[in-house]
Amino acid sequence: MREILHVQGGQCGNQIGAKFWEVVCTEHGIDPTGTYRGDSETQLERVNVYYNEASCGRYVPRAVLMDLEPGTMDSVRSGHYGQIFRPDNFVFGQSGAGNNWAKGXYTEGAELIDSVLAVVRKEAENCDCLQGFQVCHSLGGGTGSGMGTLLISKIREEYPDRMMMTFSVFASPKVSDTVVEPYNATLSVHQLVENADECMVLDNEALYDIXLRTLKLVTPTFGDLNHLISATMSGVTCCLRFPGQLNSDLRKLAVNLIPFPRLHFFMVGFAPLTSRGSQQYXSLTVPELTQQMWDAKNMMCAADPRHGRYLTASAMFRGKMSTKEVDEQMINVQNKNSSYFVEWIPNNVKSSVCDIPPVGLKMAVTFIGNSTSIQEMFRRVSDQFTAMFRRKAFLHWYTGEGMDEMEFTEAESNMNDLVSEYQQYQDATAEREGEYEEDYDEA
């Protein structure tokens, strides 16, 4: 069966990852000891996408957990589902990366990376037909960003033909842990552009806004934010894990969403948004779901799709609904808002339908869009990066670990190129497309 190998790195990655496994376990009816307690055949039909079955009938997540300090792992291990993970798959150092990308990618992380790769290799060898990898990490810290991108490039070397999907939490403008976030994020994007196939872009600020505005939470905690992320992560892969009428896998997703190889940063959304405590919407209709899904306030990264155009988009509906109605709604959205879609990619919105809804809901939808407006986010990080880099502020932390200023300059220009590529396709029209191809050949 088409297995996915999940890797989580750094504090943020481990916390999101732990939450994700809680959601997936609940959906498949697996309790915290790894025992199946579900009530329907479909839960076990493709359980091996994410789980290995142990000899005693326990289901063990195909997950590798890594960090450069033991703290977060200890809290994952002592958490509700902590005992379900394979103990050998916890790989951690003691020193920490101190929010320093260079420590994660070149010094501390480089020392630990071989033990992580050994675990990855072992899990990959146990797979029947490995479909790809999914990596959870943040780009603002040291481990998730530095060691995370190091691992991605190493996996890329060893498994060049497997899909590499990342859930990357970007540094957000208002919610910031560290002053060097723009450095870490820019250095990471430089890697992700080259080595990842698809990146789901998340951002704390947008998640905070959703929690405040839509879910009416007074003080959203990271737990609430991770809850939103895990709902989306589970939605992205539901087609792989449950039977459906229109199925998609990581590769089909990529083929439908990525018109140009470098432009693989997606904004994601989820509907219906309900706060953890209350599922006040007893039932929603497909039109209501569709409307909420396309709403700019629902996007989990701080970029406004109304400021750009969609190159492509994909919607994954879950629950019992008519495919015909789904198709009608999607066409309806495109016709009414045609200016927000590039006209030189016809039929650029795909939908898939999976029969099994998330726990506690009748129907739900996960949205993935490849919109040119995501350049806003890169542009913002780039501005912050430039402001500090001009003055060479904090650079000694990086050069002290053996980095060269040249790497910063390269990463900066790669990110700026990415921004201008998005802008170029935002402005492109069907008639002028020929000119761009010539430009590309020269470049």
From Swiss-Prot:
Record InterPro entries: Beta-tubulin_BS, Beta_tubulin, Tub_FtsZ_C, Tubulin, Tubulin/FtsZ-like_C, Tubulin/FtsZ_2-layer-sand-dom, Tubulin/FtsZ_GTPase_sf, Tubulin_C
Chain positions covered by the region annotation Disordered: 424-443
Signal peptide limits: none
GO MF annotation terms: GTP binding; GTPase activity; metal ion binding; structural constituent of cytoskeleton
Record-level GO cellular component terms: cytoplasm; microtubule
Disulfides per UniProt: none
Biased composition (Acidic residues): 434-443
This protein's record includes keyword Magnesium: yes
Chain positions recorded as GTP binding sites: Q11, E69, S138, G142, T143, G144, N204, N226
SMART domains in UniProt: Tubulin, Tubulin_C
Binding residues for Mg(2+): E69
Compartment(s) of residence: Cytoplasm, Cytoskeleton
Stored SUPFAM superfamilies: Tubulin C-terminal domain-like (SSF55307), Tubulin nucleotide-binding domain-like (SSF52490)
GO biological process: microtubule-based process
Record keywords: Cytoplasm, Cytoskeleton, GTP-binding, Magnesium, Metal-binding, Microtubule, Nucleotide-binding
Domain of life of the organism encoding this protein: Eukaryota
Cofactor section: Mg(2+)
PROSITE patterns linked: TUBULIN (PS00227), TUBULIN_B_AUTOREG (PS00228)
Role: Tubulin is the major constituent of microtubules, a cylinder consisting of laterally associated linear protofilaments composed of alpha- and beta-tubulin heterodimers. Microtubules grow by the addition of GTP-tubulin dimers to the microtubule end, where a stabilizing cap forms. Below the cap, tubulin dimers are in GDP-bound state, owing to GTPase activity of alpha-tubulin.
Family: Belongs to the tubulin family.
Subunit field text: Dimer of alpha and beta chains. A typical microtubule is a hollow water-filled tube with an outer diameter of 25 nm and an inner diameter of 15 nM. Alpha-beta heterodimers associate head-to-tail to form protofilaments running lengthwise along the microtubule wall with the beta-tubulin subunit facing the microtubule plus end conferring a structural polarity. Microtubules usually have 13 protofilaments but different protofilament numbers can be found in some organisms and specialized cells.
Protein's recorded name: Tubulin beta-1 chain
Species in which this protein is naturally found: Anemia phyllitidis (Fern)
Gene symbol of the encoding locus: TUBB1
